[in-house]
Amino acid sequence: MFDVTTKSMQWGEETLTLESGKIARQADGSVVATLGETRVMANVTFAREQKPGQDFFPLTVHYQEKYYAAGKVPGGFFKREARPTEKETLTARLIDRPIRPLFVPGFKNEVLVMCTVLSHDLVNDPDIVAMIAASAALTISGVPFMGPIAGCRVGYVDGEYVLNPTVDDMQDLRLNPEQRLDLVVAGTKDAVMMVESEAYELTEAEMLGAVTFAHAQIQPVVDLIVSFAEQCAKEPFDFTPPDYSDLYAAVKAAGEEQMRAAFAITDKQERTAAVAAAREAIKAALTEEQLADGNLGSALKKLEAGILRGDVVKGGKRIDGRDTTTVRPIVAETGLLPRTHGSALFTRGETQGLVVTTLGTGDDEQFIDALHGNFKSNFLLHYNFPPYSVGEVGRVGSPGRREIGHGKLAWRALQAVLPAPTDFPYTIRVVSEITESNGSSSMASVCGGSLSMMDAGVPLKSAVAGVAMGLILEDDGSYAVLTDILGDEDHLGDMDFKVAGTENGITSLQMDIKVAGITPEIMEKALSQAKDGRMHILAEMNKALSGAADFSVHAPRIETMQIPTDKIREVIGSGGKVIREIVEVSGAKVDINDDGIIKIASPNGDSIKKAYDMIWSIVAEPEEGQVYTGKVVKIVDFGAFVNFFGKRDGLVHVSQIENRRLNHPSDVLKEGQEVKVKLLGFDDRGKVRLSMKVVDQETGEEIVPEKKEASEAE
């Protein structure tokens, strides 16, 4: 019944297996990939015809982690998987980015790639497995795909690169100082197509070495997919790339001069209007048949790209008048918003971000329900890209994939310089509002995020800056690397290469390649040029940091204390009675962790001290030999009970009240009376033994034997 094809190989410490022919046989391509006990199914389907008038490539990549894969039931009211999580969205983008450029140019039929996590061993991250499964499914589906690709994850420990570190190793690099890199690389047999990373101030050489190492490690996987496809691939879809050379010639003849003049305008808005006018003039000169051609958009883009690229490669001149290495003018300001905890406005040319930092308590941490466990995150970065930032009218609503991806890139860049949670026990939320955009808005978020956190008083290890690099690569091998690219240069160029870091090294690298043939030499030049740009931006940012506040007066103060774990129950009390009383009396917010760390938060220092003292009185143990001030709570025939240490009571035996015989303790004591007592010790049953007679009741000083004898002699 089943015609199953299976291929396996040893990859690092695990076995990688590809299988097809048993599940989802009606899909154009279906592959189940297994690494260890992590298993992902990828299914590919594509339309046989292009929709009329469609002038773009409608590729959709969907990635979903099923809770049953890890033996879990989804949370929430409905108890089923719902909208994509951040991890699912980022993984879908991770798969989309390297495969999109590899479809045959001109192919615009709808393609759907669906990756479903079926099993997760909590060791091997399913994102890499999904990428390999998707590549294999595309390769056998018959769709015009110039792959395959493969991907891997690389760590960096003690100067050594590590292939596919475990999920636990990559959970939080701040808590694992030995692990300095989380890098994902995807590529073909000949070229690197995509890089995504989070690093702890690696040098350019270390980062380039990691990418090179990763590309070498994916070669056996590419070979495995090729041999797998040789046994089970379907017949290639009959597709001939469209020939629109005549249409392009007509477009070029009708408006090259006007389009070239439009691209000579340095102001973005004026240039955009002039380019739009040139397009309309070209369309007006074309025939109805040419206007109806579905490749008109491609012909116009080819004309625009030729003008922009030719000027850069041949003359070294960019559309805004800069050379290839110059960063646009920068203005950095902090402390703009009076009631926020920290704020910054970062402007670079026609790209601008208003970035705001808010400091919260442990209650504000983000709870994440993932396949590999539940955990909390105390650093959040949200990126918003409203339509007005590019002068357009558009959809306003929940963040899209692009906004989530850009926010995570900025998050990775800043994560490396954050203080340890034990040193700075705040939840940090950074929001980047992109108010203007003409390229590299994610890197503006990095710069603005660094400034706003410093304005809020977050003790960052160093300021972080980011810059977006571009590439123009011609067919003859000539190329130009561009620093701080514009939106048009990103759209019409061959590479988007974002680098963020400190003065000491790189904290984040993201690269997307639109063409094959990116050599190590080009990558090395791009990294070197990016470092120069980063240093320039950091110098400009430092001009704004001199006025940064030490700590926002509007932010809550947090003090931490450690208590024994066996005392947690006493602090909470039956049904939470004790902790509620502490919060009500002190006015502070109190968070208790399972490890005994307590965070006390309040804008008022007196409130924090009151809560601290109340907790300390519950958990602290009285010391033998110390003198305490207490209050008589009960009088009995054989002595008096004194509350002397928090809620702790002890017995002052009648013989320990005074240096004379008493008929009854009530002769000298009454309930509510304040007395000073010395802790003599504990009896066999753990009961507290106190003494009043060895303490001067006026001064609180202990009466030593010499003083006692002298007083008796008098």
UniProtKB/Swiss-Prot annotation:
Cellular-component GO terms for this entry: cytosol
Which SUPFAM superfamilies does the annotation name?
Eukaryotic type KH-domain (KH-domain type I) (SSF54791), Nucleic acid-binding proteins (SSF50249), Polynucleotide phosphorylase/guanosine pentaphosphate synthase (PNPase/GPSI), domain 3 (SSF46915), Ribonuclease PH domain 2-like (SSF55666), Ribosomal protein S5 domain 2-like (SSF54211)
List, alphabetically, the Gene3D superfamilies matched.
Answer: GHMP Kinase, N-terminal domain (3.30.230.70), K Homology domain, type 1 (3.30.1370.10), Nucleic acid-binding proteins (2.40.50.140)
- Subcellular location per the Swiss-Prot or TrEMBL entry: Cytoplasm
Q: Name one GO biological process term.
A: RNA processing
Any single GO molecular-function term of the entry would be: RNA binding
Reaction equations catalysed: RNA(n+1) + phosphate = RNA(n) + a ribonucleoside 5'-diphosphate
Q: Name the cofactor(s).
A: Mg(2+)
Q: What is its EC number?
A: 2.7.7.8
**Residues reported to bind Mg(2+):** 490, 496
Which UniProt key words apply to this protein? Cytoplasm, Magnesium, Metal-binding, Nucleotidyltransferase, RNA-binding, Transferase
Q: Which InterPro entries match?
A: ExoRNase_PH_dom1, ExoRNase_PH_dom2, ExoRNase_PH_dom2_sf, KH_dom, KH_dom_type_1, KH_dom_type_1_sf, NA-bd_OB-fold, PNPase
Every copy of the S1 motif domain together lies at 625-693
The answer to whether UniProt assigns keyword Metal-binding to this entry is yes
Q: Which residues form the KH domain?
A: 556-615
Show the PROSITE patterns listed in the entry: KH_TYPE_1, S1
Q: Give the HAMAP family listed for this entry.
A: PNPase
Q: Which family does it belong to?
A: Belongs to the polyribonucleotide nucleotidyltransferase family.
Q: What does this protein do?
A: Involved in mRNA degradation. Catalyzes the phosphorolysis of single-stranded polyribonucleotides processively in the 3'- to 5'-direction.
Protein name according to UniProt? Polyribonucleotide nucleotidyltransferase
Q: List the source organism.
A: Ruegeria pomeroyi (strain ATCC 700808 / DSM 15171 / DSS-3)
